[in-house]
Structure formats: structure tokens, C-alpha cells
Swiss-Prot record:
Its cofactor is Mn(2+); Mg(2+). GO terms for cellular component: cytoplasm; ribonuclease H2 complex. It is an enzyme of class 3 (hydrolase). This is Ribonuclease HII. The gene is rnhB. The keyword Metal-binding applies. Residues 8-197 form the RNase H type-2 domain. Its EC number is 3.1.26.4. HAMAP family: RNase_HII_B (MF_00052_B). GO terms for molecular function: manganese ion binding; RNA binding; RNA-DNA hybrid ribonuclease activity. Belongs to the RNase HII family. It catalyses: Endonucleolytic cleavage to 5'-phosphomonoester. It comes from Azoarcus sp. (strain BH72). It is found in: Cytoplasm.
Length: 204
């Protein structure tokens, strides 16, 4: 691809899974094709699950390039969630089949990249490429949580997707900490250091 054409390519990057207590943090990078617009792109958190699931395959089909990457639970615990998120973003951009001229990152921090990058606060709502990346990252991570739910239904991961809801914390006290939990996160660390002396009875 000619350098002049590459310089016009904008890549959007976003993540999913910084706040949950378990599972990897997932990042996606998307270069949209101006000739193949996608209606309905928006911040993934503002869309219904049904809308995200409808848009994700369209993004994969119509984008000039896209990639999804992750940082593992072990990397999150070793590096901290911020640095692990930056690592996942680096991996996603590096995995693109097309090199962009500029990368737009949702938020206020940019990972170190081989191409110019700019942080855009609220970019998942204002920049279509970031919106597309947020949808891919969210749908991939949610699918991972649903797969874990099939193996470990007692945690309720299909419902809360790993976020620290009251029901999730109660399930952790009842069933203990599985190996896919982030031990560096406060609620998990607290339970490991101070296991409950008793557990609540499950409601009928």
C-alpha cells in the first residue's frame, strides 16, 4: 500500500474487561472502510447485547482490517490492569494486516506503538472506528465469559460477565476462587486473605 494512502488510514482501539474480577482484558483494533459504512456504530456500553451481536460480524466483514488480542489473568496480576490493558492494545494493533497512519485510543492514555497514536476521551462514542473496536472487544470478551459459565455455572458469569455484583461476590464466598480470577483485585484478594467463616445459604 502506498505511504500516502496508508497515512489516511485511521485505526480505532478500545478495550473490554478492565473492571471485572476474572478473565482476560480484551482489546480490539479496527480500520474502517469509508466505502463500506456501517450504520448503528456506537459505544458498546450504550448498545444492547442483541445490537452488539448484530454489528460485530458486519464490522469483521466490512472493515479494511481488524484484530482482537488480550492480556491474560496472569499478566494482569503481574503487571496491573492498566499496563495489561496497554499490552493488549499493543498486541491488537500489531496483529493488523494493514498498517494505519494514525491510531485513536479510547480514554486518556496511549500504549507505545510503532505508528502515531492519540488518546480520545469519550472516543467510543465520538469516533466510529473506536466504536467498532469497542463492539468487537466487548462481544469477544462476553463470549469468553459465557464459555466459562458453561464450565462453572455456579458463578453466574453469563449474567454479570465477571463484574463485582452482590450476587457474584456471594458466589465467590460460597464456592471459592477459581484459577481464572484476578488475585490482585481487591474483592478477590480480600477473600483469599480472609476466607469466610461461614457461607450464606442459597435461596430457593
Amino acid at each position: 500500500m502506498p505511504a500516502s494512502q496508508r497515512l489516511r488510514l485511521i485505526c480505532g482501539v478500545d478495550e473490554a474487561g478492565r473492571g471485572p474480577l476474572c478473565g482476560p482484558v480484551v482489546a480490539a483494533a479496527v480500520i474502517l472502510d469509508p466505502a463500506r459504512p456501517i450504520d448503528g456504530l456506537a459505544d458498546s456500553k450504550k448498545l444492547t447485547e442483541r445490537a452488539r451481536d448484530r454489528l460485530a460480524p458486519l464490522i469483521r466483514e466490512r472493515a479494511l482490517a481488524w484484530a482482537v488480542a488480550e492480556a491474560s489473568v496472569e499478566e494482569i496480576d503481574r503487571l496491573n490492569i492498566l499496563h495489561a490493558t496497554m499490552l493488549a492494545m499493543q498486541r491488537a494493533v500489531s496483529a493488523l494486516s494493514v498498517l494505519p497512519g494514525e491510531v485513536l485510543i479510547d480514554g486518556n492514555r496511549c500504549p507505545t506503538l510503532a505508528v502515531p497514536a492519540r488518546a480520545v476521551v469519550g472516543g467510543d462514542a465520538s469516533e466510529p472506528a473506536i466504536s467498532a473496536a469497542s463492539i468487537l472487544a466487548k462481544t469477544v470478551r462476553d463470549a469468553g465469559m459465557k464459555a466459562l459459565h458453561e464450565q462453572y455455572p455456579h458463578y453466574g458469569l453469563a449474567d454479570h460477565k465477571g463484574y463485582p455484583t452482590a450476587g457474584h461476590l456471594a458466589a465467590l464466598r460460597r464456592h471459592g476462587i477459581a484459577d481464572f480470577y484476578r488475585r490482585s483485585f481487591g474483592p478477590v484478594r480480600e477473600l483469599l486473605q480472609n476466607p469466610p467463616l461461614w457461607v450464606e445459604e442459597e435461596s430457593a
